[in-house]
């Protein structure tokens, strides 16, 4: 059984970003909240939308920061600090360029080139020991095209693949919390949306 106490979905605030690839983490937390009939409410002291769900008898807080992606650490540190949630009890969902659409993977710790993750690491005192759920969005093929790509909307087929991977990610979060990381990883890492 995992000791996850906080699940964070990264993205950018505002309608202009709502359906962009960069908001894949936000979509995942919104789906998780919907699945548990949880209404997320704006909490200015936590710089984001928050909610609470119970999964496998565990009380879990949900957070979608209202800061821009590169300032996500402000929200995570505020909520984790207030509730005394250690980094190893945090799971952050975010978009991953290095995975194709339709794939999602868990990861524990380590570095990342993703700006939101880097800011969270910095805001947690350079502690990298939190869980990640990386939602594949694919790569545009050239480094110079990344910004426009992540801030763009995916074609319908890719969006369907990302949505399927997010749905599977939500199911695997339940397995992670009720059982363990190995079982959740085995299932999620063998999933590929067609």
Swiss-Prot record:
Active site feature: 22 (proton acceptor)
Keyword tRNA-binding: yes
Database matches in NCBIfam families: pth
InterPro entries (alphabetical): Pept_tRNA_hydro, Pept_tRNA_hydro_CS, Pept_tRNA_hydro_sf
Reaction(s) catalysed by this chain's protein: an N-acyl-L-alpha-aminoacyl-tRNA + H2O = an N-acyl-L-amino acid + a tRNA + H(+)
The protein's name in its UniProt record: Peptidyl-tRNA hydrolase
Function per UniProt: Hydrolyzes ribosome-free peptidyl-tRNAs (with 1 or more amino acids incorporated), which drop off the ribosome during protein synthesis, or as a result of ribosome stalling. Catalyzes the release of premature peptidyl moieties from peptidyl-tRNA molecules trapped in stalled 50S ribosomal subunits, and thus maintains levels of free tRNAs and 50S ribosomes.
Site (Discriminates between blocked and unblocked aminoacyl-tRNA): 12
Similarity-based family: Belongs to the PTH family.
Residues given in the record as tRNA binding sites: 17, 68, 70, 115
Top EC class of this enzyme: hydrolase
Site (Stabilizes the basic form of H active site to accept a proton): residue numbering on this chain: 95
Quaternary context: Monomer.
The entry's keywords: Cytoplasm, Hydrolase, RNA-binding, tRNA-binding
GO BP, one annotated term: rescue of stalled ribosome
Subcellular location: Cytoplasm
Database matches in Gene3D superfamilies: Peptidyl-tRNA hydrolase
A GO molecular function held by the record: tRNA binding
Pfam families the UniProt entry points to: Pept_tRNA_hydro
Record-level GO cellular component terms: cytoplasm
């Amino acid at each position: 059984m995992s000791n996850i106490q906080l699940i964070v979905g990264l993205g950018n605030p505002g309608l202009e970003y709502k359906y962009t690839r960069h908001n894949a983490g936000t979509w995942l937390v919104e789906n998780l909240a919907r699945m548990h009939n949880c209404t997320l409410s704006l909490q200015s002291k936590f710089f984001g939308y928050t909610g609470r769900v119970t999964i496998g008898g565990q009380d879990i807080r949900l957070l979608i920061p209202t800061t821009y992606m590169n300032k996500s650490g402000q929200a995570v540190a505020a909520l984790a600090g207030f509730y005394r949630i250690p980094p190893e009890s945090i799971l952050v969902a975010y978009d991953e360029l290095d995975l194709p659409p339709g794939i999602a993977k868990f990861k524990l710790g380590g570095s990342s080139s993703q700006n939101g993750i880097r800011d969270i690491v910095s805001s947690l005192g350079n502690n990298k020991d939190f869980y990640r759920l990386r939602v594949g969005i694919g790569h545009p093929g050239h480094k110079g095209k990344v910004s426009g790509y992540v801030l763009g909307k995916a074609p319908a087929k890719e969006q369907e693949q990302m949505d399927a991977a997010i749905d599977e990610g939500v199911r695997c979060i339940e397995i992670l919390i009720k059982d363990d990381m190995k079982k959740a990883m085995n299932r999620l890492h063998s999933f590929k949306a067609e």
